[in-house]
Amino acid sequence: MAKKMLFLFVLLLSLTGMLKAQVTTAGMSGKVVADEEAVIGATVVAVHEPSGTSYGTVTNIDGRFSLQGMRSGGPYKVTVSYVGYQTAIYTGIQLQLGETYSLNVTLHEASELLGEITITASKSKFSAEKTGATTNISSEQLTTLPSINRSISDFTRISPYASGNSFGGRDGRSNTFTVDGANLNNNFGLSSGLPGGGNPISLDAIDEVQVVIAPYDVRQANFIGAGINAITKSGTNAYRGSAYMYFNNEVMRGNKIGDTDFGVRAEESKTVYGATFGGPIIKDKLFFFANVEYEKSPQQVITWRAAKEGETPNNSTISRTTEADLAEFSQILKDKYRYNTGSFTDFPADVTNLKLLGRIDWNINQGNKLSVRYNFTNNKTWEAPNGSSGNTGYRLAYNRVSAYSMSYANSCYSLQNIVNSATAELNSRFSSNVSNQLLFTYSDMKDERGTNSSPFPFIDIMAGYYENGNQILEPYMTAGYELFTYNNLVKNTVMTIVDNFTYYLGAHKLTAGISYERQKAGNSYMRNGTGYYRYSSFEDFKNGAAPESFALAYGYNGNTKPSADVKFGQLGVYLQDEWNIRDNFKLTAGIRMDNLSFLNDIMRNQAIYDLDFNGMHIDTGAWPDSKLQFSPRVGFTWDVFNDKTLKVRGGSGFFTGRIPLVFFTNMPTNSGMIQNLVSITTRYKDGVVTSRDPRLELLKGNMITDVNQMISTLGLPTSISPEEGVLPSSVVGIDPDFKMPQVWKTSLALDYQLPVSFPLTVTLEGMFSKDINAVRQYNYNVQAPDKDTWSRFNGPDDRYIYPENFLQHTNISSANVLTNTSKGWGWTGNITVMAEPAKNVNIMAAYTHTESKEISGMPGSDANSAWTNVPSINGPNSSGLMRSQYVTPNRVVASINWRVHLNKKTSSNFSLFYSGYSSSGYSFMYSNDMNGNGVTNDLIYIPKTKDEIKFTSTEDADAFWKFVNQDPYLKK
C-alpha cells in the first residue's frame, strides 16, 4: 500500500519537476483587511530597492497573500492598493533567509486630502514566522563581527546550540552545509572540517547564513545536528566593489594562558588578498557579482639540512646525512633510472588558497527570477615525507627527515583540497495562487595528495651495520615517490535536483515537493603504490644487493588506480500545509518520505561470507537494502497579542540524517577484493636476522621500477574472484537492515519584546531529542558474556573476565558491523537576550545548557577504532548510555557592536565577541586491558568507601584518594 501511495505521489509531482530541500530564499505573507473585513483582490507589490526586483500578487478570497522565492535582506518597499482605499506603503522591511515575513495590512477609505500612507517597518525581532530553533546571521553581522580564522564557524558560533562544528551535542559530521542550495558538506567525514581546506567559499561572497536545529519545514532534510544554509551576494542597480587585505603573524596572538608562558613563538604569517565587484548589466533586469580571494602562508616544511664536509651534526638543524652522499645518491638515480629527485636544499613549502566566485541574477519578468552561481576553491599545503611508517613489519627507529636522515624535494607531498560547485535556481509565480521553485546543484569535492615526483619506487637507505654485523635499524636517506601519496584521493560528487510546488487555498499554503540527490564517493589509498625498496646500507644499494624489504600495492584486473566507491541515490517526497487558523496563529504540518538506494555493485569475499557468527554472516558484496524512512513534522507559531510582542512557538518531528560515507567505504576497502597488498621482508630480533623472505633474491641487481614488471617477476596474481578471496586480519561489514540515523526532536519557545523605550527582547527555548535510529559498531567476532560460564572479578567491581577463547574465530581479530540502536537522548535549555539600548548599539547574550547521551559517538573514520574507542565496563559490545563526546554542557556567548557614523558616507564599527564554556565530558580508564578482551578502553571503578578496594602500599592509597577528592565528580 505504501509503495502505491508513493508512486501516485511521485506521479502527481512529476508534472512540476524535481528538487532538493535546503533553503535559498525568503518570503512574505499576510492579510489585508478594511472595516474589519477581508479585502479580496488587493494588489500587493514588494520591491527589493537595491536591485529594483519586483514581486507582485493579489489577495485571495480570505484577503490573504503570499510571496515566495524572494531575495533575502532588503530593504523592501511594499505597496498595497485597492480601488477606493488609501494606498498603504511599507518601507524598511528586511527579510531573513528561510523565513516568511508576516505583514498584516489595514486599509482605510480614500480621502481627497490623503491618497496614500507610508509606514516604516519597526525592528521587531519576531516579524518572521519561524517555529523551531533557528539562528539567522545577517550580512551586517558577517561584516561587523570579529573573525580570526575567516571561517563559517566564526559566525555559526552565534547560535546558542553551537560548540565548534558540533550543534546540540551531535557529531559535527551529522550537520549539512549548503551554499545556494548546493551540498558543500563534509560528506566523506575523514576529518571534521568542511571541503576546500575548511572554507569552501570566501566570507566576502556570503550574504546571509541560517543555522537550523529543529525546523519543522519538511523541505529541510539530511541532518540530525544542524542545517547550515548560506546564500551568496547578488548584484544590484549600483556598481559596488571592494578590495581587502588581512594579515596576521605570531606577534598578533597571545602566548600565555594563566601563569603558563609558551616561550619563543615560531615565525608564522598569513596574508589574504581579495576583491568583490557587482552591479547591473541591465538596470532592474540583469545583475552580476564576482569575488576573487587569494591566501598565502609562507612555511618551512623541512628545517633540517644535510651536513657539509667537515661539519658536525647537531640535534636541532644539521642531520648526520652528508651532502656528498645525497648528491651521489641523486646522481645514481638520474644516470641509471632517469629519475629526478629534486633538490636536497630547497623544499616546497608555502600554503596557498585560491577562491573564485561568479553569480548572475536575471529578472526575466515579474513572475520568473533566475539565478546562476559558480565557485571554485583550491587549497594547497606541503608536507615532509612520512616520518617512519612502512608496510614491512616494523617502523624505522627515527623519522626520514631528522637528525639521522634526509630526503629530497620531490619526496615531499602536497595536500590539495579542490572544490567546484554550481547552482541554477528558477523561482516562478504562475498566478496569485500558484508558485514554483526549481533548483539544480552540482558539487565536486576532492582531497588528494600531490607531488612533483614522476612515478618511481620509494627508497629507504638504512644506516648500515654495527661492528658485530647486526643491522642498524635506522634511516639514513630517502628518495622517490612518497610511499603514501600515489593514488591517495578522496572524491565526492553530488548532484541534486529539487522542485517545490506551492498552491494557496484560502488560509492554507500547500507545498508539494520532490527531491533527488545522487552522490558518488570514493576513497583511494595505495601505500607503496609505486613500489617500495629498503636497503640495509648505501653500499648495498650501489652494489645491486637484494633489498632488505620490499612492498607493493596494486589493483586487480589491470586497474592502476583502484578505489573503494559508494554510489547512492536518495529520493525525497514531501507534502506540507501551512494553515493560518487565525490571524495570529499558524499551524504547519507535513510529512517527508526519503528512500535511499545504493547504485554500485561490489564484489563479495566468499571467505568472509563463509564465516558463521551464531547463524549470522557478513556479506561484503552487498550494500544494505533500500529503506523508506518517514519524517512527520508539526509546528506552530502563536502571536499571543497579535502585535508581535509575545510569541509562543514550537513543534515536534522526525529528522533523518546521514553518516560519514567513509563508514560505507570501510567495507570494500577492507574486503581484500579491490587491490593486493604485498610485503616481502627481513625480520630481526635485537638486530639479528631471524628470517628472510627468499623472494627478495629475485630483486637483486638493478631496481625494477615498472609496477607490471614487479608483479610478473614476483609471480603475483593479477585478477580475483569471490572464490579466490582470502580472510583479512579484520573484517568490516554493514547490517543489511541498516538505516540512516533518525532522531525525534521536540521544542517549545517563548519570544518576548519587553515594553521599554528601546528594543529589548528575551527568548526562552527548550528542546528534547530522542534517537530513533542511532549508529554504532558491533563486533560479531566477540562472544557475548555468559553469566553461567564466565568468571567475574571479586568485590564490588564484578565485571566479567574474558576467557582466552572469547573470539568466535581466532583467524581474524575482529568483525565490526555497522548497525543501529534506538538508545540515546538529549535536551537543551536556552535563554537569549537581544537589545539596542542606544542608536547603532546592538547587544546579544545567551546561555545554553546541553545534555546528550549516546551509545557511540562513532569516533574517527575507521570501523575498528570506532568500536575500540568507546569506553565500557564489559566491552564495547555491551556499552551503555554515556554522555556524548561532543556535548558542551554549559556555554555562554555574547556580542556587542557599535557603529559610529563619521560623516554621511563613512562609518566605523567596533565589535566584541565572547564565548565561555565548561569543558566536555571525559572518562577515567585503566591504562591496561582490565577485563582481557584485547581493548584498552576499560572504565575504572570508583569506590564508594576506602574499604572497597585494596592498594599495594599506603602511599598509593593516599595518592589515589587525594586525586579522587580533588575532583567534584569522583568524590560524589
What are these regions (language model features)?
Residues 714-720, 907-972:
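Extracytoplasmic gating/loop element in the C-terminal half of outer-membrane beta-barrel translocons
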Residues 203-210, 218-227, 233-327, 350-356, ...:
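Outer-membrane beta-barrel translocator/receptor signature
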Residues 763-919:
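Gram-negative outer-membrane beta-barrel transporters
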Residues 60, 86, 91-104, 115-234, ...:
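Periplasmic N-terminal accessory/gating domains of Gram-negative outer-membrane beta-barrel systems
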Residues 602-631, 636-817:
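Solvent-exposed loop/turn elements at secondary-structure boundaries
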